[in-house]
Swiss-Prot record:
Source organism per UniProt: Xylella fastidiosa (strain Temecula1 / ATCC 700964)
GO cellular component: cytosolic large ribosomal subunit
GO biological process: regulation of translation; translation
Gene Ontology MF terms: rRNA binding; structural constituent of ribosome; tRNA binding
Name of the protein in question: Large ribosomal subunit protein uL1
Length: 232
């Protein structure tokens, strides 16, 4: 296959195994963008944890200061009343209880986030086989089971991301779009890493943030030199 001059420049720019300063890494990502759509910027973070052990599982959420650039659809399970009205006022795309559950069972699952109040979990629990495999099951650890659904909806719409270390101990997360300002992407990444440090399992030994890599949807992965980040 014949490489374009641009692709050759990208291949030369990204040296395997080399850690790049955050500013240079972001510039490389933007140079490597080749899709006709606005690509997302993703981060992969290898953690020094053994997820096979229950006391070393990492799961949480972070409200990115510059958002994700995505239009997030949110469904909320909440009894009718003031809290339901708060959720709607915050921008929820669907609010309900048994009626909402019936719609989901009928195939209406076009949501990115599902939120529930604690007293609504009796209804949500029946949807485990539908929501669980899609990563939509509400969970208090990531802020999707909340006594304040209005605030939870606002956070979800404003750029809250949820994450969980996979079997290899790696966190995968979206931190924005390639058309974001460089500083916005940097701030989003730092906010995520700071929150991950806060929830470091006490049983985790050695280096916790072992490797941080950025990539665009269709671009190469770029390893980040963590010393160029502000993680305090």
């Amino acid at each position: 296959m014949v490489q374009t001059k641009r692709q050759k420049a990208i291949d030369i720019a990204v040296v395997p195994g080399k850690a790049y300063g955050i500013d240079e890494a972001i510039k490389i990502l933007k140079t490597a963008t080749k899709a006709k759509f606005i690509e997302s910027v993703d981060v992969a973070i290898r953690l020094g944890v053994d997820v096979k052990k229950s006391d070393q599982q990492v799961r949480g959420s972070t409200l990115l200061p510059a958002g994700t650039g995505r239009d997030v659809r949110v469904a909320v399970f909440v009894p009718s009343g003031a809290k339901a009205e708060d959720a709607l006022a915050a921008g929820a795309d669907a609010v309900g209880m048994d009626d909402l559950a019936e719609k989901m069972q009928a195939g209406d699952l076009n949501y990115d986030v599902v939120i529930a109040t604690p007293d609504a979990m009796r209804v949500v629990g029946k949807l485990g086989t539908l929501l669980g495999p899609r990563g939509l099951m509400p969970n208090p650890k990531v802020g999707t089971v909340s006594q304040n659904p209005g605030e939870a909806v606002k956070n979800a719409k404003s750029g809250q991301v949820r994450y969980r270390a996979d079997k290899a101990g790696i966190i995968h997360c979206v931190i924005g779009k390639v058309n974001f300002d460089d500083e916005a992407l940097k701030l989003n990444l730092q906010a995520l890493l700071v929150d991950l440090i806060k929830i470091k399992p006490t049983a985790s030994k050695g280096t916790y943030l072992q490797k941080v890599s950025l990539s665009s949807t269709m671009g190469p992965g770029v390893m980040i030199d963590q010393s160029t980040l502000s993680l305090k």
